[in-house]
From Swiss-Prot:
Family: Belongs to the FemABX family.
InterPro entries per UniProt: Acyl_CoA_acyltransferase (IPR016181), FEMABX (IPR003447), PG_Glycine_Bridge_Synth (IPR050644), tRNA-bd_arm (IPR010978)
Keywords: Acyltransferase, Antibiotic resistance, Cell shape, Cell wall biogenesis/degradation, Cytoplasm, Peptidoglycan synthesis, Transferase
Compartment list: Cytoplasm
A Pfam family matched in the record: FemAB
Protein name as it appears in the record: Aminoacyltransferase FemA
Reaction catalyzed: beta-D-GlcNAc-(1->4)-Mur2Ac(oyl-L-Ala-D-isoglutaminyl-L-Lys-(N(6)-Gly)-D-Ala-D-Ala)-di-trans,octa-cis-undecaprenyl diphosphate + 2 glycyl-tRNA(Gly) = MurNAc-L-Ala-D-isoglutaminyl-L-Lys-(N(6)-tri-Gly)-D-Ala-D-Ala-diphospho-di-trans,octa-cis-undecaprenyl-GlcNAc + 2 tRNA(Gly) + 2 H(+)
One of the GO biological process terms: response to antibiotic
GO CC, one annotated term: cytoplasm
Enzyme Commission number, as recorded: 2.3.2.17
UniProt GO molecular function: aminoacyltransferase activity; nucleotide binding
Taxonomy of the source species: Bacteria, Bacillati, Bacillota, Bacilli, Bacillales
Subunit note: Homodimer. Interacts with FemB.
Function: Catalyzes the formation of the pentaglycine interpeptide bridge, which is characteristic of the S.aureus peptidoglycan. Adds glycines 2 and 3 of the pentaglycine bridge, using glycyl-tRNA(Gly) as donor. Involved in resistance to methicillin.
């Protein structure tokens, strides 16, 4: 085995072939970091047949003018079951970054620690407890099992839906009642989905603005999304849910005809048997449905006059690789939230994964707090409704490469933090 630099082609071919390969360990992310002006390294291990068996994208940032801070975002991509390979990789990686004036090395591997349900109850161990001892022996310090959303650290909890050996019907069957109803609702109510181009990205950004204002969370800036759409190319998809009013109103009219037919039947039953309470209840229920149907038709016609035949209502931002589809961000028009457009977006992308043989649908980050007053309690409930599970990752590890200078650096940083 040998530790070596990799070409972008070698790196991409290997990371695309591996499980637990995060979108930040892809050629698209490498090209993005180059364009942003970061010092970037592609490194890995090749076996005696010159085949890549481990890979890692590193970025380096200047620290204290002379030194550099090296970071591998969700790397390396490696067979973690091969502990000998893991030891060799991190040992050689430390030597490599030391040659490049590294002050300290930071990694947050895409490696599960344990599994939980959406109530925060542990359902299983991932079998990677050995990794903590291994990293400690190699000189890495674990930063702890942090919860919540941090501006610097990667989120430690993901909500993930397993699609392996499942059909679309299986997915719907396993949803809770609300998710099931809304998914079926958007399928029949004229809600369509198409993919936005770069020129149309402001539509998505406007929805994100609506959502961030209503739910009080900090969104990324425009540059973040535009750059990833540009450099990730077909590894980013931005599905837009919209109402086609011609189809929507047509379907409502067809529904009205059926309801009127059923109502007339109920009225005839009452004429025949006036004492039949069941027929009276059925009549009342059908009349309520007809009233609601008429309101929807009137609303549809009004909105069609105001907005034209197509009305954008929701959009999402997704990362794609052979391992998983990642729901990174999404927003919905507050004015048209009742059309449940976000469910159309989710259903489109779940089916995208199924149709492309991708076994994992990642709803992405949750805080890991699992309380009613958690900042993401509503989001957790939404993701739970799809019958997803929580994966908790091992977290962050830091290795001081130049120990004396790193000790001085951290001491100085603590003083600054106290002052400011």
């Amino acid at each position: 085995m040998k530790f070596t630099n990799l070409t972008a082609k070698e790196f991409g071919a290997f990371t695309d072939s591996m499980p637990y390969s995060h979108f930040t360990q892809t050629v698209g992310h490498y090209e993005l970091k180059l364009a942003e002006g970061y010092e970037t390294h592609l490194v890995g291990i090749k076996n005696n047949n010159n085949e890549v068996i481990a890979a890692c994208l590193l970025t380096a940032v200047p620290v204290m003018k002379v030194f550099k801070y090296f970071y591998s975002n969700r790397g390396p991509v490696i067979d973690y079951e091969n502990q000998e390979l893991v030891h060799f990789f991190f040992n050689e990686l430390s030597k490599y970054v030391k040659k490049h004036r590294c002050l300290y090395l930071h990694i947050d591997p895409y490696l599960p620690y344990q599994y939980l349900n959406h109530d925060g109850e542990i359902t299983g161990n991932a079998g990677n407890d050995w990794f903590f001892d291994k990293m400690s022996n190699l000189g890495f310090e674990h930063t702890g099992f942090h919860k919540g959303f941090d501006p610097v650290l990667q989120i430690r909890y993901h909500s993930v839906l397993d699609l392996k050996d499942k059909t679309a019907d299986d997915i719907i069957k396993n949803m809770d009642g609300l998710r099931k109803r809304n998914t079926k609702k958007v399928k029949k109510n004229g809600v369509k989905v198409r993919y936005l181009s770069e020129e149309e990205l402001p539509i998505f950004r406007s929805f994100m603005e609506d959502t961030s204002e209503s739910k009080a969370f900090a969104d990324r800036d425009d540059k973040f999304y535009y750059n990833r759409l540009k450099y990730y190319k077909d590894r980013v998809l931005v599905p837009l849910a919209y109402i086609n009013f011609d189809e929507y109103i047509k379907e409502l009219n067809e529904e009205r005809d059926i309801l009127n037919k059923d109502l007339n039947k109920a009225l005839k039953d009452i004429e025949k048997r006036p004492e039949n309470k069941k027929a009276h209840n059925k009549r009342d229920n059908l009349q309520q449905q007809l009233d609601a149907n008429e309101q929807k038709i009137e609303e549809g016609k009004r909105l069609q006059e105001e907005h034209g035949n197509e009305l954008p209502i929701s959009a999402g931002f997704f990362f794609i690789n052979p391992f998983e589809v990642v729901y990174y961000a999404g927003g919905t028009s507050n004015a048209f939230r009742h059309f449940a457009g976000s469910y159309a977006v989710q259903w489109e992308m779940i089916n995208y994964a199924l149709n492309h043989g991708i076994d994992r649908y990642n709803f992405y980050g949750v805080s890991g707090k699992f309380t009613e007053d958690a900042e993401d309690a509503g989001v957790v409930k939404f993701k739970k409704g799809y019958n997803a599970e929580i994966i908790e990752y091992v977290g962050d590890f830091i290795k001081p490469i130049n120990k004396p200078v790193y000790a001085a650096y951290t001491a100085l940083k603590k003083v600054k933090d106290r002052i400011f």
